[in-house]
Amino acid sequence: MKQKYSKKSKKWIYITTIIFILILDISSKRLIIKYIKTYDTKKIFSVLNFFHVHNHGAAFSFLSDQNGWQKWFLSTVSILTILVMTRIITKLKKQETKKITAYSLIIAGATGNLIDRIFYGFVVDFIDIHINDWHFATFNIADCSIFIGIIILMRINYST
């Protein structure tokens, strides 16, 4: 009896993590849309700006210069990623918490960016990290979630 409760509570931890990241991602993007005009910048710290930009492509604006087909392609890739990662999680042993966490983070990020593509036709990016005049690619919380999930998976795969 106790083991079933433990297994269910662990599932809820991962589901709650996904929901929390989605709420954080969607809320932050809505605030950016509401308070910062497109292509405007708000300085937060010396190395951090909020720069409101619309990304019609993938990471690093890959495919953003295409004529619209990329929205459907990237949405399909996101849906397949979410489905595959969910299937992988259901096949993992409950003791593989690091892998489940990593896949949950990737699912949350892919879902956040998919929601943007469906509702806006693009992904809202706003986190601008820079040193003087050098700026890293602008990103969002969903991108951070995907990145952290990938880093966790890489550490798991390369530490054994």
Curated annotation (Swiss-Prot):
EC number: 3.4.23.36
CC terms in the record's Gene Ontology section: plasma membrane
GO biological process, one term: proteolysis
UniProt membrane topology term: Multi-pass membrane protein
Signal sequence residues: none
Transmembrane segments annotated in the record for this chain: 13-33, 72-92, 104-124, 134-154
One Pfam family this sequence matches: Peptidase_A8
Family affiliation: Belongs to the peptidase A8 family.
Protein name: Lipoprotein signal peptidase
Protein species of origin: Buchnera aphidicola subsp. Acyrthosiphon pisum (strain APS) (Acyrthosiphon pisum symbiotic bacterium)
